[in-house]
């Protein structure tokens, strides 16, 4: 099955989207320190996908971005204290109502700059969650790692700045949950966002615990071959 790209959708304005924002505010108000906002990185050039808009690539019947957003709502319904969701993406990527948008200025500054932009947008809302999750749209099942990361970070207390997925070989800093203030300091030291900076260089300064994570959660889709394999249900 061949994946389809550049799907456009109107902004959604249904009651479900409104109730999602209400649920985010309730989750944060209940215990702001342990509530988690989530930043989904959905920018970039899509170079290995022939320039396609990666969040709009369709596989298994949904855009890659929508797999992540739907998964987050599933976790919310299961009781994980999720706050607001902010997608770092250009204006042409359609987002559901209730999902915030951010974009580094100028665009294409790299994921570290994208995280800083997302934190800036989330920080304008009140109340503000104490934790911030980082996911990427090209890992459509990455949301499955969040409950274990949340448990690890909350149980550890202030001695840890974050908890990240580990794929058996590497710590995946872009699949992680962090204390908001520590993350903000790492990506925007002195309040100035870093640009074109390696993720490991910026986030590697934080005190994080690597949590073993299932293969499906860390699997990212960077090429058409990987998209087609995942779309068809093949392991590779």
Report the location of each language-model feature.
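N-terminal nucleotide-binding beta1-loop-alpha1 segment
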Residues: 2-51
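Short, intrinsically disordered, low-complexity terminal/loop segments
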Residues: 1-2, 236
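Intrinsically disordered, low-complexity segments enriched in polar/charged small residues
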Residues: 14-20, 59, 184, 233
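Nucleotide and nucleotide-moiety/phosphate-recognizing core
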Residues: 31-196, 201-217, 224-225
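Short, basic/aromatic-enriched C-terminal tail that caps enzymatic domains
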Residues: 218-236
């Amino acid at each position: 099955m061949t994946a389809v790209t550049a799907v456009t959708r109107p902004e959604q304005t249904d009651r479900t989207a409104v109730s999602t924002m209400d649920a985010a505010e309730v989750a944060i108000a209940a215990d702001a320190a342990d509530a988690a906002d989530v930043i989904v990185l959905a920018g970039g050039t899509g170079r290995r996908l022939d320039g396609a808009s990666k969040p709009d690539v369709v596989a298994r019947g949904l855009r890659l971005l929508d797999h992540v957003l739907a998964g987050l709502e599933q976790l919310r319904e299961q009781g994980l204290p999720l706050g607001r969701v902010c997608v770092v993406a250009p204006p042409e990527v359609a987002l559901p109502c209730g999902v915030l948008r951010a974009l580094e200025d100028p665009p294409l500054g790299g994921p570290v700059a994208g995280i800083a932009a997302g934190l800036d947008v989330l920080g304008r809302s009140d109340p503000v969650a104490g934790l911030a999750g980082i996911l990427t749209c090209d890992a459509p099942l990455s949301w499955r790692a969040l409950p274990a990361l949340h448990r690890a970070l909350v149980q550890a207390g202030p001695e840890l700045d974050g908890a990240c997925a580990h794929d058996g070989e590497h710590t995946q800093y872009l699949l992680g949950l962090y204390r908001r203030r520590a993350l903000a300091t790492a990506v925007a030291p002195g309040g100035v966002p870093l640009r074109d900076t390696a993720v490991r260089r910026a986030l590697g300064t934080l005190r994080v615990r690597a949590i073993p994570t299932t293969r499906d959660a860390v699997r990212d889709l960077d090429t058409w071959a990987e998209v087609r394999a995942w779309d068809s249900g093949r392991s590779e």
